[in-house]
């Protein structure tokens, strides 16, 4: 099992290219199930979750061609991948694969819309709270589907003639449930109106792609999305938007380690709340023609309180990274998590590096310290793992992060990108 070794104390200076967003790429890939034509996606990151979803889609009948060939391109960024699903050959999504990644559960929407029935295992993925599927079930039921849970699977069936458009308001904002209901509604009869919809940029990206495929979706990016059903979708070519979580992660790494870095192929507008929070913490951030520049030279890190919220609020996927930054602040800060329960598993690992953090319910109190000290630590989930890397960049001595397969799920060549900017980061294979 691989480990990441970090020698702290080095500023970051240089250019870091930002990859395509994993959280956008996954639903876009799943949308290929909605058409028998070819969906071509550009700027697809090379990540473990993307590779796993390719396998899952292949089981359903999707032919996958990477950069025009059917082999993996290990040495290239921004891959172009062609997805063609002439016929759906299997409407069952097995526990063996779905349990490894929660987002693969989202195939339930396109399979139900195109084939009228499917059997999908209940999901797995990051160990962050319960993440119930109730919202998915309720949304699809509103479109006329019958849903039955049996032996760890959901058996879903559309009414004769297909799904039927309806008005439905989610009781709680859910990005995944919004993705699924939006995809399913594209082929439903009549008009669907989704209330309390997720407003994340990844939802807008999916809607733009579906519209390019012939869907009729309006309102994406607002709390109300309207979908006029069509009889079929065609192929399209679409570029995956930049990864705002990767952007924020590297911005926080620079704020932690110090230095001057340009983040290329991204957009400040994708994470305005996080950028403003970093400015309050003492980082100097400015937009560039193709991204953003972040500097922190000499000045200390100021304590800032945050509360995670759905977009446009502070992203839960940057909470662990920001907490790592606050461990070196000049005072006391508070981090309150409102999206997921049990998303403080990184706290005890940060404490091994010398962080002073106390928990009270869903709020963490962080007392900034003058120095962190390197130590062996263990990744517990995707975002927590990178928070340990950020802390290691500023810790005295050597930090080793184990279980880095979590990192490989969501960060493309992290150690390479950091090393190019002067960090001492090394992957150790065992």
UniProtKB/Swiss-Prot annotation:
Active-site positions on this chain: 126
One term of GO molecular function: UDP-N-acetylglucosamine 1-carboxyvinyltransferase activity
Cleaved signal peptide residues: none
Entry GO terms, CC: cytoplasm
Residues that, per the record, bind UDP-N-acetyl-alpha-D-glucosamine: 102, 131-135, 172-175, 317, 339
Annotated keywords: Cell cycle, Cell division, Cell shape, Cell wall biogenesis/degradation, Cytoplasm, Peptidoglycan synthesis, Pyruvate, Transferase
PTM-bearing positions, type 2-(S-cysteinyl)pyruvic acid O-phosphothioketal: 126
Top enzyme class: transferase
Principal place of residence: cytoplasm
Record bears the keyword ATP-binding: no
Annotated positions binding phosphoenolpyruvate: 22-23
Pathway where it operates: Cell wall biogenesis; peptidoglycan biosynthesis
Localization (cell): Cytoplasm
Keyword ATP-binding attributed: no
GO biological process terms on file: cell division; cell wall organization; peptidoglycan biosynthetic process; regulation of cell shape; UDP-N-acetylgalactosamine biosynthetic process
Pfam family, any one: EPSP_synthase
InterPro entries (UniProt xref): Enolpyruvate_Tfrase_dom, Enolpyruvate_Tfrase_sf, MurA_subfamily, RNA3'P_cycl/enolpyr_Trfase_a/b, UDP_GlcNAc_COvinyl_MurA
Classification via HAMAP family: MurA
Role description: Cell wall formation. Adds enolpyruvyl to UDP-N-acetylglucosamine.
Protein name, UniProt field: UDP-N-acetylglucosamine 1-carboxyvinyltransferase
């Amino acid at each position: 099992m691989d480990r990441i070794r970090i020698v702290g104390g080095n500023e970051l200076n240089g250019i870091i290219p930002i990859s395509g967003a994993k959280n956008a790429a996954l639903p876009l890939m799943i949308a290929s199930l909605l058409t028998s034509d070819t969906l071509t996606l550009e700027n697809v990151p090379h990540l473990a979750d993307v590779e796993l979803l390719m396998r899952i889609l292949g089981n359903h009948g999707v032919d996958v061609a990477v950069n025009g060939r059917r082999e993996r391109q290990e040495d290239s960024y921004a891959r172009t991948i062609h997805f063609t699903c002439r016929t759906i050959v299997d409407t069952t999504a097995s526990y063996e694969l779905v349990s490894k990644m929660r987002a693969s559960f989202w195939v339930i929407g396109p399979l139900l819309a195109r084939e009228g029935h499917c059997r999908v295992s209940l999901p797995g993925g990051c160990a962050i709270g319960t993440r119930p599927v109730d919202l998915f079930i309720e949304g699809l039921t509103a479109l006329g589907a019958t849903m039955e849970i049996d032996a760890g699977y959901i058996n879903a069936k559309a009414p004769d003639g297909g799904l039927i458009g309806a008005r439905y308001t989610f009781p709680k904002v859910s990005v995944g449930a919004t993705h699924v209901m939006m995809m399913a509604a594209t082929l439903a009869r009549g008009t669907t109106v989704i209330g309390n919809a997720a407003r994340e940029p990844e939802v807008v990206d999916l809607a733009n792609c579906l519209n390019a495929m012939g869907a009729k979706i309006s309102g994406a990016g607002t709390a109300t999305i309207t979908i006029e059903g069509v009889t079929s979708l065609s192929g399209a070519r679409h570029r995956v938007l930049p990864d705002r979580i990767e952007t924020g992660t590297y911005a926080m790494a620079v704020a932690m380690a110090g230095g001057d870095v340009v983040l290329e192929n991204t957009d400040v507008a994708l994470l305005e709340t996080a950028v403003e929070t970093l400015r309050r913490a003492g980082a100097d951030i400015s937009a560039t023609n193709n991204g953003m520049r972040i500097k922190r030279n000499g000045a200390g890190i100021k304590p800032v309180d945050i509360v995670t919220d759905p977009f446009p609020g502070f992203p839960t996927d940057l909470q662990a990274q920001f907490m790592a930054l606050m461990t070196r602040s000049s005072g006391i800060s508070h981090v309150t998590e409102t999206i997921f329960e049990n998303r403080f598993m990184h706290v005890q690992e940060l404490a091994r590096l010398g962080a002073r953090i106390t928990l009270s319910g869903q709020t963490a109190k962080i007392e900034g310290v003058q120095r962190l000290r390197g130590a062996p630590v263990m990744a517990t989930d995707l975002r927590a793992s990178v928070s340990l890397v950020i802390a290691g960049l500023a810790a005295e001595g050597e930090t080793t992060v184990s279980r880095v397969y979590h990192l490989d799920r969501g960060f493309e060549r992290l150690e390479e990108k950091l090393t190019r900017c002067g960090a001492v980061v090394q992957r150790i294979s065992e």
